[in-house]
Amino acid sequence: MLVSLSYRPRGSIIERIDPRARWIASILMLFAIVQFWDIRFLLFFFILAVAQYIATRLTWEETRRAWTIIIIIVASMVIINTLITSSGTVGQVMQAGHAILQLHFRVPLVGWMIRFDLTIERLWFALAQMLRILSIAMFFMVIPFTMDPRIYGITFRGMGLPDRLAFTMDLAFRFIPTLTRDFSVTLDAQRARGYEIERTKGGLIAQVRKVVPLVVPVTMNSILTGEDVVNAMDLRCFGLHARTWIQTLQYRWYDFAIIGFSVATLVAAIVIQPVFHIGGFWVPAWIIPG
């Protein structure tokens, strides 16, 4: 399932913000969020992320596929990594907690002993992990939908990246919708020839063979497109001299305010958690019985 990150002007408040300020603020918020496991602090970032998402004026139809992928990733990480294996939990959760469900059984033939203990602490940690991932996802997910693809290059260049790296990032973001379009065109063409991907049956090898008519044309077309871009850049002697950009970006007062708020938030997070050790995993006393 490919996601088309299509941009269209919406006239939202978020689109007026300098794209450099948006990237800087999102990155700083990312580093601030990962400092905490306390739901009280994570709710603050989650509310900020939701407020930004609402301000973008994005609709469910536009972001439905992106949300589907995010929800699948979040569910997989929370259910498998936290509730079942506990490999992603912090030390407090790994210790014995207040059990809600206990399953202990031995696997026949091999004799493996399976122990599954679902505790209040694990459930609360799963909620914290979900808020953490969703907050980070919302801060970054809205960028491709609300940022003009023509200014990606100058945005990364304005953030201090070299011309080559800035242009590479620009091409990478432009390539996603192109790949989606090629995939859709190829799928429609193969369906016109009687290809039915929905009826994929059999084992792993049979399923791989079934998707070959889609993967091979899309991959070959992507390689040829990449070669065309490289040849065009070589013919224009890209990289020999400093690049000039058509678009120009200029910070405004609210851009500095957003960056300043993000910096202050990160500094506060660093001081609160690593220095004062506040914001670690926390379970409210009212949900623990007796």
Show where each model-derived region lies.
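Transmembrane alpha-helix interface motif
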Residues: M1-I39, I47-I54, L161-R164, R181-G290
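Short helix-capping/hinge motifs at transmembrane helix termini and TM-loop junctions
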Residues: W37, T56-R57, I84-T85
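Structural signal for the C-terminal ends of transmembrane alpha-helices
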Residues: Y53-T59, M147
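Juxtamembrane/interface alpha-helical elements of multi-pass membrane proteins
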Residues: A66-T200
